[in-house]
Structure formats: C-alpha cells, structure tokens
Amino acid sequence: MNEARIFGITGPPGAGKSTLTNALTKCWRAKGLRVGIIAVDPTSPFTGGAILGDRVRMGDLTLDTGVFIRSMGTRGQLGGLSPATAGAVHALDACGYDLILLETVGVGQSEVAVMEIADLVLVLNVPGLGDDVQAIKAGILEIGDLFAVNKADRPGADRTANELRAMLELGEDEKRPLPVLLVSASQGTGVTELCEELERQYLLLDGNGELA
C-alpha cells in the first residue's frame, strides 16, 4: 500500500521533537493534507507505565479532523519505537492519510528502528548538547536524510549547524548532500522552509529509486 509519505522525526531528549511535529503539521494542514502522527514515549522499566505527554504539546491540533494523533509507549523495545508502531503506520496509510509522522524517543546507537519504517528521517539537534564527538558516538549522523538545529534563537545554534555540516562532509559514500537547516519550532521561524525541504528531499529519494 504505502501511498502515504512517512517521515521520521528523531533526535536527543529535549530537542523539541513534539513542538516541531506540531509546527510541521500545521504547515501541511495549511496545504490541505491529512496528517497522522505517531508519538512514542519511553516506558518505565520499573512500573511498566509511560507518560504519554507528546499530545500535551499538540493540544491545538486535537480538534482538527484532518489530524490523527496516537501516543505509544516503547514497552521495553529498543529502537526508539513501539512494537505496535508498524501496524499503526499501515492502519493510517489504509485510512488515506497523506503524511504520517513518526516521532521517536531520544535516539542513540541502538535506537534507529525509525529508518526501517520511514521513507525519510529528520534528525533534530539543539545547541549545547555536547561536542561533535558525542554526536558521532550517539549514532545520529548515520540515520538522517536531513538535519535541523532547533531552538535557533539560542546562542551557539549557528556553531552547532556548522559542526554538523562539517561532520556530514566527512561521509564519503553520500550520494547527495545532506542539508542542515536552522529552525525555532516554538517561534515558527524556519518551519515553512523545513517543511518544503522535507518534501524536496522526499522527491529526490523517490526520483533516485531509494524509497522502499
């Protein structure tokens, strides 16, 4: 089936993934597209419960009939997603949604399952989370199709973006340059540009036959 475009949004905890998901959804809704959102939160290893708080940051979307939001706990599964994520994606696809956004828990070396489901993966970063060596250790550079530095109004945002660009240039096997954009999801700055770049990168991947 897979008529919907499936975009993964990942990055470290505190990067503003839910706020950005909310902002991007508004951008696509303004174009008349129906958007399904699957937001994954970590499950406690002690209680087995999960605080499904992603929808709190998307409260202004809850009355929009063109948006479906489903929060899930990881239930102990590694990979940054829930065991039920793939099934939920197929269900939303079957329901005719134009876009499906997968928001993962904080990503690390073992949390890259989103790249197996999504057509395209956006890796989000923010200033002040550590140096470039730590970013490489976290494994986030290997899974992204494009990158964004959120909270661009903070000091160090330009430096973080430039460091990411420098690290990405070290990749010798890349078939295409990987863009790094600056955005402030809470203020709306750069969101439209990111929305358009996501669509452009999807078309590039599709044209190159790189989509599953």
Give the ranges of each region predicted by the language model.
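Flexible active-site lid/hinge loop adjacent to a nucleotide/diphosphate
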Residues: V114, P127-P155
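Active-site-proximal loop->helix
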Residues: G48-D54, A135-G139, N162, E169
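Nucleotide-state-sensitive switch-loop elements of NTP-binding domains
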Residues: M1-F7, P12-A15, L20-S110, M115-D132
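Short, intrinsically disordered, charge-balanced linker/junction segments flanking boundaries
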Residues: E210-A212
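Canonical P-loop GTPase G-domain recognition
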Residues: I143-G207
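Short acidic active-site motifs
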Residues: Q109-S110, I136, G190
